[in-house]
Amino acid sequence: MRSLIIVLLFPSIIYSMSIRRCEKTEEETWGLKIGLCIIAKDFYPERTDCSVHLPTASEGLITEGNGFRDIRNTDKL
């Protein structure tokens, strides 16, 4: 029963999906891109010592908690 609920909920969390051929000459190879929106309740962040340089922006900060990683652009904070 639990697996049936997961199967029924999975399509509802996909907000975008596109399928295209990897190469126009190949008919059997396809690329798949799926966007997911994940909402985590009771997220408890912990500061890490990891700092990331984002080439399109300035610096980013990685925060971890409950198995999720959060990367933020410090220009917008």
Swiss-Prot record:
What's in the keyword line of the UniProt record? Late protein, Signal
Recorded hits in Pfam families, A to Z, give: Pox_T4_N (PF04491)
Q: Does the keyword Cell division apply?
A: no
What is the induction note for this entry? Answer: Expressed in the late phase of the viral replicative cycle.
Q: Which domain of life is it from?
A: Viruses
- Signal sequence extent: 1-17
Recorded hits in InterPro entries, A to Z, give: Apoptosis_reg_M-T4 (IPR016399), M-T4_sf (IPR038687), Poxvirus_T4p_N (IPR007580)
What family, per the record?
Belongs to the chordopoxvirinae B9 protein family.
Protein name in the entry = Protein OPG195
Q: Which organism is it from?
A: Vaccinia virus (strain Copenhagen)
